[in-house]
Amino acid sequence: MNSTQLDSLVHAYFALAISFNIVSLIMRDTLDKTLTSTDPVTGTTIMSAYYAMFLLHGSMPVVPKLIIVLAFLYSITTAGILKHIRNFSPENYYSRLSWFSAIAINSFGVLSVGLLTISQIPS
């Protein structure tokens, strides 16, 4: 897979993640129940900030870019995957599908961002 394809996957990830949090926010406001235990406003804000940094990463020097990517990978792995795996409780999730979707979307993000970063390391 070339870096253009990987770049498209990363854009798809952020679109999915932000959309998931927006749907969760709408559900909270209409049904008083979120998709996951993550606060949807916090989730949307964090994902939007990371997406903005991703969009600007082409103009960044290598070291700051790597620091941001490593921080992103760490935070999404711990808060977006492991937290959901460890803390599953039916009252914190709309359904098992929403629980699984949060884990799947964030796993896709870690994989796509990680692969894109590796592909950009000069040989």
Question: Across the structure, where does each feature detected by a protein language model lie?
Answer:
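Hydrophobic alpha-helical segments of small multi-pass membrane proteins
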Residues: 68-77, 99-107
